[in-house]
Amino acid sequence: MQIQVDTREHKKEWERIRTQFDDIGVKYFRSKMYVGDYQSLDNPRLVIDRKKDLQELCGNVCQQHERFKAELVRAIQQDIKIVILVEHGEDIKTLEDVYFWQNPRKHEIRWKTVNGRKVKTVCSEKAVDGMQLYKSL
């Protein structure tokens, strides 16, 4: 099996994944991909779009919606199936777990000074939580 890896994959993440590929003997090469981050040359109509965690997926679905949607449309037009792989961690094992996920950006409290008084503010009141993300999937 040989894997094509998108050259735009984050350097730090690529180094971690490259080490894993090397450890288990997976052959790979890097080049710019039309959609996604990884694909097997055995099945070029199936690609993997890797997300570091649910916060990255929220950013794609909400803040970068048009770019993310355009990538999905390009895949559909070329009859490419995309698997979105979210490497969130041990607390998310199933799609249903996403529903109960608490976005730390939505609940992070910061103090700022307004007119000489300290005021408590939420880091990002518009941040998407698990229930909203689940419903959009």
Per-range role (PLM):
Residues 14, 32-137:
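Extended, alpha-helix-rich binding/interface surfaces that flank or overlap catalytic cores
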Residues 1-43:
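Acidic-basic catalytic patches of nuclease active cores, encompassing PD-(D/E)XK
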